[in-house]
Amino acid sequence: STLFPYTTLFRSQEQFATQRMLSEATKYSLGIVNKSLHNLKNQGYINEDNKLTDKARKDLNNKSPQNAIILAAGLGMRMVPINMQIPKALIEVKGEILIERIIKHLHETGITEIYVVVGFMKEEFEYLIDEYGVKLIVNDEYSHKNNLHSLYLAASHLKNTYIVPCDIWCEKNPFNKYELYSWYMVSDRMD
C-alpha cells in the first residue's frame, strides 16, 4: 500500500524499539514493515537508526493540517424526531455536545482555524464563535442541497483541511498533527 510508508514514517517518530512493535502498532505484516523502512531509507526519509531526516520533517510540516471544515447545515433526517428541537451537531452524547467534542479534539491537535457550515437552526451555533473562536459559513440552501454544496461554500478555505461531519462521536481523538493525505471522516465501524 502506498499509504504504509507514511504510516511507518509517523510511527517511527514514536520511537518503536523493534520492527515487530511497529508491525503490531500499524497492523501491517513484519515483511511490509521491513520493506517500507528499507524504502524510506532509500528515499532519504529516515536514517540508519530509523530516525526522521530533515527531508522527512520538511515534508511532514508542509503537509500538516492547517484548518478544519465541519459540515453542520443539514436537517439530519435520520435522527428525526430527536433533532427537531435541536440541530444534530448540538445533541449531547456521553455528557458532551457532539460538535464541541470535535472542536476540542481539533484544538488538542493544534487546529484552531475552524469553519462550521450551518443551515438548519443556524442561530443555535452562534455561541461557538465566542466560546471556541470558530467561523460560521451559512448554507441557505441546506434543505434541498447536500454536503457537497456546503463544501463548495467553504472551498476558499481548503488547504490541508480536515473535512468533518458534525454528527460523529469518537472516543479517542482521530486527528493528527501530521497528515500526508486528505481524508473524509466517515466510518460504519464502532470504536
Each language-model region and where it sits:
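Conserved N-terminal catalytic core of the sugar/cofactor nucleotidyltransferase
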Residues: 10-67, 96-163
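Conserved core of the sugar-phosphate nucleotidyltransferase
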Residues: 46, 171-191
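Short, small-residue-biased leader/transition segments that mark boundaries at the very start
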Residues: 2-9
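Structural signal for conserved beta-strand scaffold positions within catalytic alpha/beta enzyme cores
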Residues: 92, 138, 184-187
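Short amphipathic alpha-helical segments
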Residues: 81-84, 127-130, 174-177
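Glycine/Thr-rich phosphate-binding loops of Rossmann-like dinucleotide-binding domains
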Residues: 78-79, 124, 171-172
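The conserved acidic donor/metal-binding loop of glycosyltransferases
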Residues: 166-169
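Glycine-rich N-terminal loop/short-helix segment of MobA-like nucleotidyltransferase
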Residues: 21, 59-92
